[in-house]
Each structure stands twice: as structure tokens, then as C-alpha cells.
């Protein structure tokens, strides 16, 4: 009887990354996606540890779909690929900033960004007036 080779280890996030993440009750972290050279905010997606690992190691962004309960790699169907330039964790560990080179539309509606045309009415502040407040 011949020996079977040991199964390949299941890849995981580096411990220092996994330990720093503060996940929601579903094990997910918000991922803000930004165009690397213009700083344009493109979209918000969700990642679990495996989606983040895939994003950090493949050069392409992978999200976890909350509605479909499955992984999806941006651009596999549409061709609108997000090429990873950097990933950063915020100070609280509960959000990621994924800087990308976006090919085509980022939004499933076909627009460049998911934040087109739905601005809300606000009272705009003035940073110059902050020193005048009493």
C-alpha cells in the first residue's frame, strides 16, 4: 500500500490581518473601493476573510455577496475588472479601503461609480467658520 500525500493546507489570511479585523455578526467587513489615481469612490462591497485573502493574493477584487451567499470576483461576468493596487484597514479594523484600477463601470447599473446622481440634501458646513463658533 502506498502512502497518500498530505492534503495541501487550506490558505488563510495572515494572523496579523485576521486578528486586526472587526467583523459584523455575519463575519463580514465593509470594503470601500476607490480609484487609485483619482481618489474617486467607486462602490461599497463586503468581504469575509476568504474574500479578503483572495483580493490580497490574486490582484483582483473578490467580494462576498450577502444576498447570494457566495463569492464573486468583480468583472468575471461584465468584464469591468478591478485591478488591486493596495488594501488598507481603517483605525478601528471594521472597514477596508481597496484602491483599484477600474476597467469600465464599477456599478452594476452601468455607471462609473455607484454614487452617481443620488445626492441627498444637506446643510453644507464651512471649515473656515469653525474657528468663529462660540
From Swiss-Prot:
Belongs to the PRA-CH family. Its EC number is 3.5.4.19. Its main location: cytoplasm. Homodimer. It holds the Pfam family PRA-CH. This is Phosphoribosyl-AMP cyclohydrolase. One of its GO terms (biological process) is L-histidine biosynthetic process. Coiled coil: none annotated. Zn(2+) binds at residues 91, 107, 114. It catalyses: 1-(5-phospho-beta-D-ribosyl)-5'-AMP + H2O = 1-(5-phospho-beta-D-ribosyl)-5-[(5-phospho-beta-D-ribosylamino)methylideneamino]imidazole-4-carboxamide. Catalyzes the hydrolysis of the adenine ring of phosphoribosyl-AMP. One of its GO terms (molecular function) is magnesium ion binding. It comes from the Bacteria. It comes from Arthrobacter sp. (strain FB24). Pathway: Amino-acid biosynthesis; L-histidine biosynthesis; L-histidine from 5-phospho-alpha-D-ribose 1-diphosphate: step 3/9. One of its GO terms (cellular component) is cytoplasm. It is found in: Cytoplasm. Mg(2+) binds at residues 90, 92, 94. Its cofactor is Mg(2+); Zn(2+). Binds 1 Mg(2+) ion per subunit. Keywords: Amino-acid biosynthesis, Cytoplasm, Histidine biosynthesis, Hydrolase, Magnesium, Metal-binding, Zinc. Signal peptide: none annotated.
Amino acid at each position: 500500500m502506498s502512502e497518500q500525500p498530505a492534503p495541501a493546507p487550506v490558505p488563510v489570511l495572515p494572523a496579523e490581518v485576521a486578528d486586526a479585523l472587526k467583523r459584523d455578526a455575519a463575519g463580514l467587513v465593509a470594503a470601500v473601493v476607490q480609484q487609485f489615481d483619482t481618489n474617486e469612490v467607486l462602490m461599497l462591497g463586503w468581504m469575509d476573510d476568504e474574500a479578503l485573502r483572495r483580493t490580497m493574493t490574486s490582484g483582483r477584487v473578490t467580494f462576498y455577496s450577502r444576498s447570494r451567499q457566495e463569492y464573486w470576483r468583480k468583472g468575471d461576468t461584465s468584464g469591468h475588472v478591478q485591478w488591486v493596487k493596495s488594501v488598507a484597514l481603517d483605525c478601528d479594523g471594521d472597514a477596508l479601503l481597496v484602491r483599484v484600477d477600474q476597467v469600465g463601470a464599477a456599478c452594476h447599473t452601468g455607471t462609473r461609480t455607484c454614487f452617481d446622481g443620488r445626492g441627498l440634501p444637506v446643510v453644507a458646513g464651512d471649515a473656515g467658520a469653525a474657528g468663529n463658533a462660540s
